[in-house]
Amino acid sequence: MSWTEKYRPGSFDEVVGNQKVIAEIKEWIKAWKAGKPQKPLLLVGPPGTGKTTLAHIIGKEFSDTLELNASDRRSQDALMRSAGEASATRSLFNHDLKLIILDEVDGIHGNEDRGGVQAINRIIKESRHPMVLTANDPYSKRLQSIKPRCRVLNLRKVHTSSIAAALRRICRAEGIECPDDVLRELAKRSRGDLRSAINDLEAMAEGEERIGEELLKMGEKDATSNLFDAVRAVLKSRDVSKVREAMRVDDDPTLVLEFIAENVPREYEKPNEISRAYDMLSRADIFFGRAVRTRNYTYWRYASELMGPGVALAKDKTYRKFVRYTGSSSFRILGKTRKQRSLRDSVAAKMAGKMHISPKVAISMFPYMEILFENDEMAYDISEFLELRDEEIKLFRKRKIKAPKRKKTPRKAEIKVGPLYSQKKDKGADKSINDKATDKSAKTPIKSSKKDDRPRDESSSSSDDKKPKEKQTSLFQFS
């Protein structure tokens, strides 16, 4: 059994540090036992501050404990199956409370975690049992919707003197002789991480009855470095071993790369040094891309060598000057261009829907759209077709679009068949007139045929010649 498990505190009295937080936890437990449901506890703090240990001690105050690691069960279905039903049900005959522990709720990352945060919020809302959640990063975006539903307790790093006292008790229990200055140095190196200090002590004491300064130097290491310390070591030193030690940081390695890239021109003076440094950084970025694409994170090792020792050796000599290092400007640029990027994505989505293309292809067409929008009439037609807002139109042209004054033109169908249509119309009119005449003659009674003794002129005689010889005397009689 490791010493961290062997000497894990079993009660609140044995916990090192964060006494104010422990007092609030005791009040929370007391309220639950009095039948007053409370918000879930969200224990937030860096590694080694005792979050999981406190959760286990709280579990001893209730009848049962259900512990889940949220980063292992990331999807909504997995979380609901594991904790959803258990949190929403209570026995009809047993009123004992069950503690539900969700560890590392800020460890949900990636596309596979769809619905994970929503599931946690749903479990919190429906839970009829006390809940304790733990997280390392208080500023994680995953906690934005969870924090309002919880009682947040921030755990601070354990003080160096408290860590040294805990290490001293372990040495006495194990029968190991260790000077106080060595224990203080171990505590200092742990940077407030009690678990890390105990692990270091166990590693140094293996097979030994006494720990002296010589063992301390042999086991010397800096568990984690500050981000700016790592950047300073890379840019100020040419010592490869020193740079490698400084590169052991807890931050995202791509963030370290951005910080180094931002400060290279501030430290290096010669153009060839800057060129070599950025060549190393670009190669490191390629390996980061491969790691993400193939999910083979051993590529990070090569990226770390390139952006650490590679950049450090890119300079011909170290510069003994004061340089004020700054953070990555990419975050400031992204903040300033957030609105513009939002408009770009909105227009790309509209183009993709209307033109049946991908948003990526739509964005690649923006330069051509700027050319098309130089024509007022075309700009008006395109903006009407895509249903663009005024602020979206400004992506392609600065001045407003005026509605063009167009002449009224005949409809397309009339242009094509206009003469034919008019001819058909005239023929139809003549036909209707003839039909009316036929109907009128059909209704008029037929007079008896008698010779007319009145004189007739030439016109009448000519018209009589055209008449049939035998007159029709009945509607049903035909010649």
UniProtKB/Swiss-Prot annotation:
<feature type="compositionally biased region" description="Basic and acidic residues">
    <location>
        <begin position="449"/>
        <end position="472"/>
    </location>
</feature>
<comment type="similarity">
    <text>Belongs to the activator 1 small subunits family. RfcL subfamily.</text>
</comment>
<dbReference type="Pfam" id="PF21960">
    <property type="entry name" value="RCF1-5-like_lid"/>
</dbReference>
<feature type="binding site">
    <location>
        <begin position="45"/>
        <end position="52"/>
    </location>
    <ligand>
        <name>ATP</name>
    </ligand>
</feature>
<comment type="function">
    <text>Part of the RFC clamp loader complex which loads the PCNA sliding clamp onto DNA. The complex possesses DNA-dependent ATPase activity which is further stimulated by PCNA. In conjunction with PCNA stimulates DNA synthesis by PolB, relieving inhibition by replication protein A (RPA).</text>
</comment>
<keyword id="KW-0547">Nucleotide-binding</keyword>
<dbReference type="GO" id="GO:0016887">
    <property type="term" value="F:ATP hydrolysis activity"/>
</dbReference>
<dbReference type="GO" id="GO:0003689">
    <property type="term" value="F:DNA clamp loader activity"/>
</dbReference>
<dbReference type="GO" id="GO:0006260">
    <property type="term" value="P:DNA replication"/>
</dbReference>
<feature type="region of interest" description="Disordered">
    <location>
        <begin position="402"/>
        <end position="479"/>
    </location>
</feature>
<dbReference type="InterPro" id="IPR047854">
    <property type="entry name" value="RFC_lid"/>
</dbReference>
<dbReference type="Pfam" id="PF00004">
    <property type="entry name" value="AAA"/>
</dbReference>
<dbReference type="InterPro" id="IPR003959">
    <property type="entry name" value="ATPase_AAA_core"/>
</dbReference>
<dbReference type="InterPro" id="IPR027417">
    <property type="entry name" value="P-loop_NTPase"/>
</dbReference>
<dbReference type="InterPro" id="IPR003593">
    <property type="entry name" value="AAA+_ATPase"/>
</dbReference>
<keyword id="KW-0067">ATP-binding</keyword>
<protein>
    <recommendedName>
        <fullName>Replication factor C large subunit</fullName>
    </recommendedName>
</protein>
<dbReference type="GO" id="GO:0005524">
    <property type="term" value="F:ATP binding"/>
</dbReference>
<keyword id="KW-0235">DNA replication</keyword>
<feature type="compositionally biased region" description="Basic and acidic residues">
    <location>
        <begin position="423"/>
        <end position="442"/>
    </location>
</feature>
<comment type="subunit">
    <text>Heterohexamer composed of four small subunits (RfcS) and two large subunits (RfcL).</text>
</comment>
<dbReference type="InterPro" id="IPR023935">
    <property type="entry name" value="Rep_factor-C_lsu"/>
</dbReference>
